[in-house]
Regions:
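Conserved "HGTGT" condensation-loop signature of ketosynthase/thiolase-family condensing enzymes
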Residues: 1-115
């Protein structure tokens, strides 16, 4: 059996744009659940949720990337980048060959299916 080490984490969610903000919001007891705001929300039976607000993709991606990446991909890549930065590791050579990513989502990419 090989040893697994969690070296970094990242998140963009309804109460924070990174781990530090999220932990601060949790300590303050902040709730990220609110009315959902997007097109066709009236078709849903539940109209509240943990929606991400104040995310500005153009601060993180160039025009070509924005045309290729849906919102889910943008958020996923940014959270991954945060995790890599937090790890302090440089991913080259042997370490690159034994590195993996575990991703969790509660329905990512659904907007792309709708489109």
């Amino acid at each position: 059996m090989k040893r697994v080490v969690i070296t970094g984490s990242g998140t963009i969610n309804s109460i924070g744009q990174n781990i530090l903000q999220t932990m601060g919001s949790l300590k303050e007891g902040r709730c990220g659940i609110s009315d959902l705001i997007f097109k066709d929300v009236e078709r849903l039976s539940v109209k509240i949720g943990g929606q991400i607000h104040d995310f500005e993709p153009d601060k993180h991606y160039n025009r070509q990337q924005l045309s290729l990446y849906d919102r889910y991909t943008q958020l996923t890549l940014l959270a991954g980048k945060q995790a890599i930065q937090q790890s302090g590791l440089s991913f080259g050579g042997e370490i690159a060959e034994s590195t993996g990513v575990i991703l969790g989502t509660a329905g990512g990419g659904v907007s792309t299916w709708d489109d």
